[in-house]
């Protein structure tokens, strides 16, 4: 190719590129495998475990997170998953069990295929300076033990972690945990709804602690009306206005949050709705997320 031909070809390529719409250059992403926290359908699981697991798969969910096995042995629960083409990368385990029964939780995780063991909650009497310091110590020890077993430990937040606590130097308990746990041993399962209700911006935490959030809970919140749940257990006090709702039906800007999934390190997205009344609720959330591009 001579110099003149090269210049003409380059100019032609520039014209074609300039004629493309701006949005064509922007890559879009979607959630490859939407997950469900089974607490959403807890009452249905108590009535018919196998049938409920099958229904979850039929909706389109590809993975689930356990919060108890609803009377089933780990092998029985795993068999139900395998039968329906589901996997369970994560499970919740109470703080008391993490302190006293961690070997059993690890054994269950290996049978079930869990890659994460998550502490889901800190009880109200422990939400003081000494309690948070103790929790950080327990989490670091648990993270070391689970890592040796090929499993990652994590903590799941609510909203009560975002109230300044005396004895922590005015810090938020959530910030205290981030600062006083080893980021390699202790990850965070960020509940995006409860963080928002707590007045915090998930993206700000993604920016300040990149890669710390491999798991997220996805549920929406609307300030309109009020449901039968006062959410005092999650928030630390009764909520007088607003209630949980299906993903896409509330006020949370999911596209803005999920555009930062790479920075956050998100690997698994679990829909949850404490107030779900039927399969219609997890179905609505699934359909929204399955179509969402960001």
Where do the protein language model's features map onto the residues?
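Active-site mouth loops of central-metabolism enzymes
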Residues: 37-47, 91-98, 129, 246
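Acidic (Asp/Glu)-rich catalytic clusters
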Residues: 28-29, 53-58, 72-88, 101-114, ...
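Active-site acidic/histidine proton-transfer and metal-coordination neighborhood
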Residues: 10, 63, 70, 87, ...
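Histidine-acidic metal/acid-base catalytic patches
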Residues: 4-17, 23-35, 42-57, 174-190, ...
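Active-site beta-loop-alpha junctions enriched in small/polar residues
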Residues: 39-41, 67-69, 93-96, 122-123, ...
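Structural motif corresponding to alpha-helix initiation and N-cap regions
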Residues: 46-50, 71-75, 99-103, 129, ...
